[in-house]
Amino acid sequence: MIAFNSLFSLDKKRLKKLQRTLNTINSLKGQMATLSNEELQAKTTEFRKRLVNGETLDDICAEAFAVVREADERVLGLFPYDVQVIGGLVLHQGNTAEMKTGEGKTLTATMPLYLNALEGKGAMLLTNNSYLAIRDAEEMGKVYRFLGLSVGVGVSDNEEEDRDAATKRAVYSSDIVYSTSSALGFDYLIDNLASSKSQKYMPKLHYAIVDEADAVLLDMAQTPLVISGSPRVQSNLYKIADELILSFEEQVDYYFDKERQEVWIKNQGVREAERYFRIPHFYKQSNRELVRHLNLSLKAHKLFERGKDYVVDDGEIKLLDATNGRVLEGTKLQGGVHQAIEQKEHLNVTPESRAMASITYQNLFRMFTKLAGMTGTGKTAEKEFIEVYDMEVVRIPTNSPVRRIDYPDKIYTTLPEKIHATIEFVKQVHDTGQPILLVAGSVRMSELFSELLLLSGIPHSLLNAQSAVKEAQMIAEAGQKGAVTVATNMAGRGTDIKLGKGVSELGGLAVIGTERMKSQRMDLQLRGRSGRQGDIGFSQFFVSFEDDLMIESGPKWAQDYFRKNRDKVNPEKPKALGQRRFQKLFQQTQEASDGKGESARSQTIEFDSSVQLQREYVYRERNALINGESGHFSPRQIIDTVISSFIAYLDGEVEKEELIFEVNRFIFDNMSYNLQGISKEMSLEEIKNYLFKIADEILREKHNLLGDSFGDFERTAALKAIDEAWIEEVDYLQQLRTVATARQTAQRNPVFEYHKEAYKSYNIMKKEIREQTFRNLLLSEVSFNENGDLQIYFI
């Protein structure tokens, strides 16, 4: 029986309900154990028949869980604990299970994945990296295959492998798929760039379990997945803008608020720019690109910090994941920011590419019929999980009591004091032989602590974005006697740290944090590296008034206190501030930081709603064309719409003496180069009929030439128009968001401004699709090559 004493009252009620189902599952244990392998495997077919006959997943849940539990033991030698069954039930219900480090989330997922896969609509488990997806699919896949289900892996251990549509279709048609969140997102975007049925592979998104759910669904929610296409014309303004920004004086030429992460050019800076470039009006339309590049350069210098937001590796800017400090391979900032950072670091500026398609994790995962999550730290963000994803967070009891001691923070006035105190504490703990995990907030700070430990003669390993290739080995050794591992917060998630021989007697793993992170969940993840599965251990954080958290989110009185007392301390004789108000201060500041993060993610949802509506519309129309269904961009309808719109334009806006020129121009630009002209005496109705006649003749001629391939031609003409317009729209909306955010400084609501402009652009895009489809149908040249393949040349 599970003890509920330590849980929130709401969790008590939830868990009591789940306890009844657990009791039923436990009562089936003996029955399942008596079944032969063949009889146990036959249960899968039985369950599927029962679902077809009208039973629901909830009806068969207890029995299905009991089957998987028995299969887990027979195949893996692992029998899920009661707490793991409870976690599996939470996942089946479409909620997030908060399970502490080492509690066996991988095994827990086998039960809800099996159950939900029985419907034949697909079930996915999405991990943080390819290694985990491949490993878990291989290990847990043995259980699913034993029970007659197919298993696919959406990633490859060969990064160079380029999977074709047929391979991906085979993966996604599997009963259960293991992949990563990013791989799924990019596959979704690529699938919606397909031009034929044979190139499509993605099923409807049905059920998914997201590992490290808070990191993916919350912390990474603002990071868009972007497929880039053809490059923009390379700009030489990055270098010029960078030179001017370097000469600017903070708070004189530009305003910078580190707390709010806002920066913009002030009036004095505008005057300096006008003098520098010898232009009379800085914000004139013709100077738009110059203004854009200056703002990009300003952002690069003030909002992006080397060693914290990115590293320079082999002449390239590599972004760091804010949630775990890992390098985001293959990821670039959009809208020119990446190029501005390259210029700031005096690297070769890479071409700025257009965004062909993009989607945020929020919108990707909200497309699933049922979504569940697993994490070690989700409870503090339950309100946001409910509001954004309609997912409750249920804290699952640990199988063994948590024996880790979390000590109150040691608080210092200045950064040098804190660093000195931290190193002295590390020396004391190291002398006992107790293993230490020392966690810094950035690559730069981790390297500083590493240098200080070297000077102190303490051997250690350094784990950060620059040394991530050795991560698994370092983590495996971090729990050994006498080990000291210096790491960024990338050590907070991933492989468990197992204690070496004799370490428990020394007190277990010591986790030493050198600053509070921006989110309480990150701190909880770091603390959770110690005390795994009932192990002994402790955590201790060292903080100061100069930490990023306090600078960016601290109250004014704290900043005043620092200015008043910073010169009164001796860094070599650090003095901890023991008053209760300071402990409360750092706790409240972190809560404020969490609130800002939630607010920023909420704004991302508001911004992205316009893009999501447009994306759904475009993808729906594309799929209708590919599947041969009637949609808004049916070629036949477009001919009528475009010609009718042109006649309405002639009737309302064109003088009679300009009529012939306008009609001839329309024919030449959109329909045919064989211009025969029209008579002055023709009425608008006659002109309309004349244009329809030209269109019908051109299409009849192409139909006669292409025969059965004419439908393919029509579809290709419309798809090409949609794709060209959508690429322009995605790119424009990215630029628009940057501009709209900047308008906040002019006392305007950035979201309102964005939606207003996005709606205008949306209508322009639809008009452009119709007109370009019209041109593609009529002005294109078609033929067959010597192999009999259809060739289309669009003008």
From Swiss-Prot:
UniProt cross-references to InterPro entries, sorted A to Z: Helicase_ATP-bd, Helicase_C-like, P-loop_NTPase, SecA, SecA2, SecA_CS, SecA_DEAD, SecA_motor_DEAD
Cited CDD domains: DEXDc_SecA, SF2_C_secA
GO biological process terms, semicolon-separated: intracellular protein transmembrane transport; protein import; protein targeting; protein transport by the Sec complex
Enzyme Commission number(s) of this protein: 7.4.2.8
Subcellular location: Cell membrane; Cytoplasm
Residues binding ATP, per UniProt: Q84, G102, E103, G104, K105, T106, D496
Superkingdom as given in the UniProt entry: Bacteria
Keyword vocabulary terms for this entry: ATP-binding, Cell membrane, Cytoplasm, Membrane, Nucleotide-binding, Protein transport, Translocase, Translocation, Transport
Membrane topology: Peripheral membrane protein
Catalytic activity as recorded in UniProt: ATP + H2O + cellular proteinSide 1 = ADP + phosphate + cellular proteinSide 2
GO cellular component: a single term: plasma membrane
Keyword Cytoplasm: yes
Class of enzymatic activity (EC top level): translocase
Coiled coil: none
GO molecular function: ATP binding; protein-exporting ATPase activity
Disulfide bonds: none
Family classification: Belongs to the SecA family.
Stated role: Part of the Sec protein translocase complex. Interacts with the SecYEG preprotein conducting channel. Has a central role in coupling the hydrolysis of ATP to the transfer of proteins into and across the cell membrane, serving as an ATP-driven molecular motor driving the stepwise translocation of polypeptide chains across the membrane.
Assembly notes: Monomer and homodimer. Part of the essential Sec protein translocation apparatus which comprises SecA, SecYEG and auxiliary proteins SecDF. Other proteins may also be involved.
Descriptive protein name: Protein translocase subunit SecA 2
Organism: Streptococcus agalactiae serotype V (strain ATCC BAA-611 / 2603 V/R)
Lineage, highest ranks first: Bacteria, Bacillati, Bacillota, Bacilli, Lactobacillales
GN (gene name): secA2
